[in-house]
Amino acid sequence: MASTSSLALSQALLARAISHHGSDQRGSLPAFSGLKSTGSRASASSRRRIAQSMTKNRSLRPLVRAAAVETVEPTTDSSIVDKSVNSIRFLAIDAVEKAKSGHPGLPMGCAPMAHILYDEVMRYNPKNPYWFNRDRFVLSAGHGCMLLYALLHLAGYDSVQEEDLKQFRQWGSKTPGHPENFETPGIEVTTGPLGQGIANAVGLALAEKHLAARFNKPDAEVVDHYTYAILGDGCQMEGISNEACSLAGHWGLGKLIAFYDDNHISIDGDTEIAFTENVDQRFEALGWHVIWVKNGNTGYDEIRAAIKEAKTVTDKPTLIKVTTTIGYGSPNKANSYSVHGAALGEKEVEATRNNLGWPYEPFQVPDDVKSHWSRHTPEGATLESDWSAKFAAYEKKYPEEASELKSIITGELPAGWEKALPTYTPESPGDATRNLSQQCLNALAKVVPGFLGGSADLASSNMTLLKAFGDFQKATPEERNLRFGVREHGMGAICNGIALHSPGLIPYCATFFVFTDYMRGAMRISALSEAGVIYVMTHDSIGLGEDGPTHQPIEHIASFRAMPNTLMFRPADGNETAGAYKIAVTKRKTPSILALSRQKLPHLPGTSIEGVEKGGYTISDDSSGNKPDVILIGTGSELEIAAQAAEVLRKDGKTVRVVSFVCWELFDEQSDEYKESVLPSDVSARVSIEAASTFGWGKIVGGKGKSIGINSFGASAPAPLLYKEFGITVEAVVDAAKSFF
């Protein structure tokens, strides 16, 4: 359907883009050649620039292996492909125009590769977006979400009807301004902050590789799907993408295929102003196979051949760099930053319709395009039915493996799993909660099939190694210890992908609590996307001692208590640590953070797994009538201090209640009656103690209460001295309590 003027514009802009590549070392990969798409005719000057670019780059470094060049038979008539691609473009244009906000440029430029993926390559069932063995797609450049909504609409997903497209970016719609997996079935992960999506995709691909290695048999492949992603220049600039892609290459995730939308435009202008590295060479160095598709605008056969080649490379992920024109088809805004994040405007929409020869009304999908895409509903049903039959045969032959895999697919935990968690008495030897956490992790891994995880190069400090299992590596993907290296941000986002792959995959990841500063973006997406990742955060206070304030968390607990849909646990001993894990494993749509001590702590009388389930509970009380003289409230290592202070006060004749406030969020969920039983409203004499910022404690202790904590950075010294110098002591609690009498 493209007009002559449109094709001329396309080739002119494409030549400029490829010449732009030749201006530095970024374009040094050999590209597909000899493939001609419908209407694709580069000018002589364009060909000369390409040749000059390639000649220049050959002098810069040895050529990588050329991509296989072959004639690929298109699976679909080229005219319907053109029409389908333009349908995607104009659904995006029209939705953004109606909303008066959005990002039309990416959908207009990426429509060809996205069409080929969803219409010709990917396996999915539109009527069951949660079919286990579907291919996964991640739009890492989430601002271009109208591309994804248009694809889901054309493919027949019930979640995106025409009316939903018309409600793009509106209150209560299924088509929000960035993809949200919890809002729109068919969307795998929540993306928007750039780089998160490609890191999620690494997690999805890791999950596939791990499950395939564990459960596939020579005569039965029941886990066999690909993960595809589209990422842009912005994703490439973000450090998280390099962290995650480095691991993808190291792990050899051969079923991860990422399309790099190479359009040279960022919000502030041409990428030349800030981004001139050689992405191709970087990804080769990261262990990826790299292919360059020069013509992403109309080069359908090039895109098909690139995907075909990528699937032949099974020992490493593939990056397909697709040179596109942002806002393709817009006569006055294509290839400019102005088309990135704003509606085209009425006049430019009309000009684009004329330019691309598109006579249809807004939101109208031509009948032949509808008919063409309608086949995905029966084909998807057949794909799922065939897989179900294969799994039924697998279940008969391999019942034990099938039972484990079903648990992972459904999220149903084995009966009695919680009995594996250790329990403790006050007579049990005291220990750091990080060590007690390791006991819980290893107990859970033996009974929960989908339990896996690791640390950011701190396994021996975080105590997170699963002793019964080896390391997940390229040659041993069936193992369950994940070695993330010093990549906190990538680690968190990869775990999000693992958690969102299957309900029964329960990933955990670990580092020092203070280094959540390096991964907070991923942790926030965990909460937003309802990914039940377990964050094992050790060295939770000044109790870590001599490493000093760079390693001592102060404000971190308060900040995570402020984060929606997040459980912030700070257990005091073994029973509370086990209780925190019991909750974390069952909360599959809420991430849990466990702040754990480096220093040894005693097992306290009165603590219990059941108490943790309430979030806050009484561990000792010598009062009557629910009216103690004072209530002492502690968390983690300071609960012991509260208990010791209570004994001092009781010797002075005061009645004292000691409350463990292990998880504020769970306490907030309890009934008013229960809350009153723990914190009676007519008892205003309350003292909290926590070796962290006192921010937020006011709502717990009330206007007349007192909060003991640390509202400055820590210091380098032995832990006992730090507690004394910062006033986190029994004496300080006793003095605060006595001020009420």
UniProtKB/Swiss-Prot annotation:
Cofactor list: Mg(2+); Ca(2+); Mn(2+); Co(2+)
Name of the protein described by the UniProt record: Transketolase-1, chloroplastic
Organism from which the protein derives: Arabidopsis thaliana (Mouse-ear cress)
NCBIfam families documented for this protein: tktlase_bact
Positions of thiamine diphosphate binding: 143, 192-194, 234, 263, 340, 488, 515
Region (Disordered): 22-51
GO cellular component, one term: plastid
Catalysed reactions, as listed in the record: D-sedoheptulose 7-phosphate + D-glyceraldehyde 3-phosphate = aldehydo-D-ribose 5-phosphate + D-xylulose 5-phosphate
Homology family: Belongs to the transketolase family.
Subunit organization: Homodimer.
